[in-house]
Amino acid sequence: MRWPLIVLAVLVIVLQYPLWLGKGGWLRVWDVDRQLQAQRETNQRLEQRNAGLEAEVRDLKSGNEAVEERARFELGLTKPDEIFVHTPRKP
């Protein structure tokens, strides 16, 4: 009576191993799902950044105001007879 129980327990363990720890097991599926969620969050962040950059490029292509603003703030350039006063923000 003892041998069939031992054989059955070993058989259950042998059949459960691939399900939990095998190549397509639950642990691997859980890990891939976690990686997928992290990648989706990264993609969403990058899409928002790209949208902002696209808007900035459109603004730079369409008008001179954005170019003038960049020239003032980044390069410190001014128009003739213009005084530019820049007050830095507190960090």
Curated annotation (Swiss-Prot):
Subcellular location: Cell inner membrane
Cytoplasmic face residues: 1-3
Family matches, as InterPro entries: Cell_div_FtsB (IPR023081), FtsL/DivIC (IPR007060)
Coiled coil segments of this chain: 28-74
Main location: membrane
GO terms (BP aspect): FtsZ-dependent cytokinesis
Any one Gene Ontology cellular component term annotated for this protein: cell division site
Superkingdom of the organism of origin: Bacteria
Keyword annotations: Cell cycle, Cell division, Cell inner membrane, Cell membrane, Coiled coil, Membrane, Transmembrane, Transmembrane helix
HAMAP family (alphabetical): FtsB (MF_00599)
Annotated family: Belongs to the FtsB family.
Function, in words: Essential cell division protein. May link together the upstream cell division proteins, which are predominantly cytoplasmic, with the downstream cell division proteins, which are predominantly periplasmic.
PANTHER family per UniProt: CELL DIVISION PROTEIN FTSB
Quaternary structure, from the entry: Part of a complex composed of FtsB, FtsL and FtsQ.
Protein name (record): Cell division protein FtsB
